[in-house]
Structure formats: structure tokens, C-alpha cells
Amino acid sequence: MKIRTGCDVEQISRFEGLLKKAHFCQRAFTDAEWEHIENSGHPEATAAGIFCAKEAMAKALGRGLFGLLPKELGVEWDECGAPYPVLTGSAAEQYGQVQLAVSISHSGDTAFATCVALEE
């Protein structure tokens, strides 16, 4: 059994400009994530947290974003609002057998996420 962790931290204010770039948003966020960002009331913080989660997942998988699209490392939310990872495309093909858990947090102008990966 292998256990890996990944984490990432982002400056929330950086996403004020990034969210205005359609190309970035289309490549980085799924439709469900974009809907969550738009409905959050704090779009920059929400987007930064989601992006941190994607980076944390990529690191926990042991490769970073090399060869993966950020959009393939998805984040969805359960009925209590807790985030959980959803892999699609080549990420699902390569890592569908790996169990992932993700957590996202914010403080001031900082978003942080951590991911734990368990591979049997």
C-alpha cells in the first residue's frame, strides 16, 4: 500500500485577473466547478481553493500536472458542502484505482488545499 500527500497554497487576489481570462477558466475548471464559483459569493477565493485542490491532487498522485489537464482533476461537493475529488479523462484512466481525499481552506488572501492518496 502506498500513501502519498500533496498540498498547494495560492494567493487569492491573483485569481481576480485569472478569472477574467476565458482560456484559463475553460482549461482549469469543469462546468460544475464554474457553477460553484459563480454561486459562491466569493468567486476569487472559491476558484483559488479549487485550483489548490487540483494541484494538491496532482502532487499526491506523484506527478504534478505534467501530462494532465487541470480540468481532469475535478472537485465536487457533497450534501454537507465538503469537497471531494472526481477524476475524468486521462487522469481517471491512469489513476482511477487510487483513492483520494481533499480538503480546502482559506485565510485572508490565502487559499490552501491538501490531498491524501491511497493506492493498494
What are these regions (language model features)?
Residues 1-120:
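Core catalytic alpha/beta fold that binds nucleotide/phospho-ligands
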